[in-house]
Amino acid sequence: VGDDGRCESSENLDLWATIHRGSMPRLMDPSVSWDAFYTGYVRTYLERDVRDLITVKDEASFYHFLVACAARTGRLVNHSDLARDAGVDTKTAQSWLSVLRASGVVRLLRPFWSNATKRLTKTPKLYFTDTGLACHLLGWSSPETLRRGAMAGHVFETFVVGEVIKSYLNAGGDARNVHFYRDARQREIDLIIQEGRVLHPVEIKTSATVTREAVAGFSVLNDVGDYDVGAGAVICQTREPYPVTATVKAVPVWSI
């Protein structure tokens, strides 16, 4: 995810406010305090929703684990790192990640895999389902501190991935057809939407302007075998759609 060329337009500042606010239904009411809501949400989650799944003495460690997961949204899952940060063993970290998935706090995005291309990662990526909760856990107290922070790109990617999956499901798609691409040479494509034997590559950029170089990595799909490469997209902060190449279009975040 690129983080260059961030635009200062009012639309894009509103976008960062939306990302920071999160998607919880109660927060659609602007009079509801963001900080108070998420403080109460986390407390209720730990005291009620999780208590039946972990022992009470582990609540503090589980909170640290929750924060560690937020700090890794948009990244490959590494159970050892999560376990270290929470002060638990790897087996516990794996179990707790399952708890977060089952309760809808995080999702794991599976990598694209093809028998024709063995050198692809099998490790999923971790995404929070609500960017507001991730911002709260990480102490990003305002949209501006988020936008200027070190994790802006990862949180932006988390938001876009969530919106793409929601839009795809609303259109009758199957979330199991949404992947990412990463191979042994660490070449990556943020999203792959698979429709039968056709792969649609999607890149996510925080910038408002993208060039052909931003999608040069899409060419790795030509080596996958048994698949065709369909129309691609770069989801970014442009105001209007425009062609990047003959087969790739820049798409505004607001339109997904």
Describe these PLM feature segments.
Residues 197, 224-226, 238, 248:
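Structural signature of nuclease core domains in nucleic-acid processing machines
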